[in-house]
């Protein structure tokens, strides 16, 4: 790329082949890329949303209508489009649901911004107006939100069901919602008078076979491993559990030492000493009263034999994350040296049992006292069903946790978006300058959610929006679309509820992404290297700066 100096001479700044888009061209290109991403997932929004089939280079197929999964599976290259994908990832990390809403909203905010840019309104003014609008929108959402009691399990089930609607688990939705609420409440903890939930303490284990109704909540852990020795007990009641982060093996020396053996007796003595050391390790474990051992490292074949003789059930190569969950579930402490193991380090469970699930052996740790880690074992007829059920349950866990932590919910069905849009238009009348147009554009953009819900349900979006606006003008704050019969109803009465955090996070993420993309007025893209140049780069042969 060349630029002219003051005296008219050309100054080379970048190598030949670079592409540069400046001003409106850059903004138009970025907005278009972001809107394409939003349009891709828009048809998946709501209970009647369509699914996407994604096939990768290896021929693996993913069928889903989960926004973040679709965007992660797509190989998106455009930098502005990637920013919108980040919106979905942030929403997923923060709340677990509302990813499609956030992306669709970001796309529509940029669409409205493009109209304002064509009216010669500066991007900074639009961004400032959007910021004013999102702050006011969050205030409005706080005002219209309903408080919930943490013990109100019915409302929590409704929240879980709303998150799972349209995600391939319809026939078992009520049952799965009940499991999710129980699981989340089980791992909830109180800190400084507030409910704190780490959803990582709920393990989701998938196994094909059976139906969705066979999914079960285990108040303990399910480990996808089997006993290390067939002579070990298959079932241990009143289990005393040891968690070891060290191998039950004879350590090899770190130095390259050699032992010279000159007669068979020396070799025999060497083998016997190894056996004695392993026997002592097993005796030490047995002396503490442990009858179940979960080991993060390996267990020597001979040690397996000694453990089996002592009637101890042992599992090896357990994942670190599973060990941590086992500790929370059973009350055990993870020990890094067998010599340090004591009775106080042992955890407890009513039963530890090896069971066959869909032809595979798994270890079930059940009947733990007030476990702070639990497992949901997901079943389903095919791999695609199980995968989609996992995504639905993950979303439900996220929203139930958010509702319990915040204690506030809003209606679904597009109700909060229409109400916020209505109040924002009133607020815009008091805004001076061109920012007023941006606030009004923000209000219009919010209505993309009810409009899309209507379109995806085969309804007329204009008719639905007219009805919704009329109801909200009459003060019916929770009026939303019943996508099943096309009527406008009270969403709280219909049981369509979402945590407040889903909406506030979607608004914040979408607005920030839209602002960031609007502020870009120059895109400089390096040219792609040819295969020959790539080979030169790899060989270190390129000397161009």
UniProtKB/Swiss-Prot annotation:
Q: Taxonomically, which superkingdom?
A: Archaea
One Pfam match: Cpn60_TCP1
InterPro entries assigned to the protein according to its UniProt record, in alphabetical order: Chaperone_TCP-1, Chaperonin_TCP-1_CS, Cpn60/GroEL/TCP-1, GroEL-like_apical_dom_sf, GROEL-like_equatorial_sf, TCP-1-like_intermed_sf, TCP-1_chaperonin, thermosome_alpha
Q: Which Gene Ontology MF annotations are present?
A: ATP binding; ATP hydrolysis activity; ATP-dependent protein folding chaperone; unfolded protein binding
Q: Report keywords, A-Z.
A: ATP-binding, Chaperone, Nucleotide-binding
**Gene3D superfamilies in alphabetical order:** GroEL, GroEL-like equatorial domain, TCP-1-like chaperonin intermediate domain
Is Magnesium one of the keywords UniProt gives this record?
A: no
Report the family membership.
Belongs to the TCP-1 chaperonin family.
Role played: Molecular chaperone; binds unfolded polypeptides in vitro, and has a weak ATPase activity.
Q: Which PANTHER family match?
A: CHAPERONIN (PTHR11353)
Subunit structure, interactors included: Forms an oligomeric complex of eight-membered rings.
Name assigned to this protein:
Thermosome subunit
Record the organism. Answer: Methanopyrus kandleri (strain AV19 / DSM 6324 / JCM 9639 / NBRC 100938)
